[in-house]
């Protein structure tokens, strides 16, 4: 099972007695969604699910569930990844000229955040109709809720390569004003609760390590919508995600 860690005082059971003998059960949990197995013995089976992306670095499915959180992607008839979220485990911190860029390798000497061995890759595309949501959280009833807390983001090697050396499609290196931007939008009952923008590449500057993004301003959510935009046409719209934190509250009355 892919890791969904419980942080802090993970579960609190509250029983309150009233005049009518009513009570409620309340579970308050900090969830950490890490895109790798819980246990070492599961690693080999996990690795065997990887394919595509060069050197067996990618695993994809129309829906990847980790705890109560679903991560969606779009596949073609041959089950090749078209867009959305997939899992990856490659790394490449070399963006020198002539390097063959990888769309799925994180631009880092290590792999995931905190040195983990896997992470997620998000790809935004208009080439295929994407799922309704990028990430959706299972909320069991009307009294329960979830709030996004944070996520760690990073660049893929192909994006850095294209920004530093150009795309090879009559597009030169990035200059002032050029960008690759990730937008994370929280929604609840299909209504926007808040938006967070992250500059992955800004002119000649770009993320060189896993970077924490605070998401508490998004408020209570039941889904996250991710979008990548660039100032350049035909730019590789990919980024990496890891260690996504949520505050999850279940209340049964």
Identify the function of each model-found stretch.
Residues 23-133, 138:
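N-terminal targeting leaders for non-cytosolic proteins
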Residues 131-141, 165-172:
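Short secondary-structure capping micro-motifs at structural edges
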Residues 153-156:
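Short glycine-rich beta-strand segments
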Residues 1-4, 11-42, 248-253:
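Bacterial Sec-dependent N-terminal signal peptides
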Residues 43-44, 159-161, 233-235:
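Short catalytic/ligand-binding loop motif for oxyanion handling, primarily in non-cytosolic enzymes
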Residues 162-182:
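Short coil-to-beta strand junction motifs in C2/discoidin
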Residues 176-253:
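Terminal, low-complexity interaction segments
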Residues 141-150, 220-221:
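Extended extracellular/luminal ectodomain segments enriched in beta-structured repeat modules
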């Amino acid at each position: 099972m892919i890791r969904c860690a419980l942080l802090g005082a993970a579960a609190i059971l509250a029983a309150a007695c009233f005049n009518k003998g009513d009570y409620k059960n309340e579970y308050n949990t900090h969830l950490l969604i890490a895109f790798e197995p819980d246990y070492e013995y599961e690693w080999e089976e996990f690795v065997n699910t990887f394919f595509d992306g060069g050197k067996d670095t990618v695993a994809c499915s129309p829906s990847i569930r980790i705890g109560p959180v679903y991560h969606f992607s779009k596949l073609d008839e041959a089950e090749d990844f078209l867009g959305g979220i997939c899992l990856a485990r490659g790394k490449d911190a070399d963006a020198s000229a002539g390097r063959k860029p990888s769309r799925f390798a994180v631009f880092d000497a290590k792999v995931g955040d905190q040195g983990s061995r896997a992470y997620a890759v998000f790809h935004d595309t208009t080439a295929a109709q994407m799922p309704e949501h990028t990430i959706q959280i299972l909320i069991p009833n009307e009294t329960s809720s979830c709030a996004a807390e944070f996520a760690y983001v990073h660049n893929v090697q192909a994006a850095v390569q294209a920004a530093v050396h150009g795309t090879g499609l009559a597009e030169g290196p990035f200059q002032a004003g050029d960008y690759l931007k990730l937008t994370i939008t929280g929604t609840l009952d299909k209504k926007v609760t808040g938006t967070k923008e992250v500059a992955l590449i800004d002119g000649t500057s770009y993320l060189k390590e896993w970077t924490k993004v605070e998401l508490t301003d998004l408020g209570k959510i039941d889904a996250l919508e991710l979008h990548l935009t660039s100032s350049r046409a035909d730019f590789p719209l990919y980024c990496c995600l890891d260690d996504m934190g949520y505050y999850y509250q279940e209340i049964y009355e």
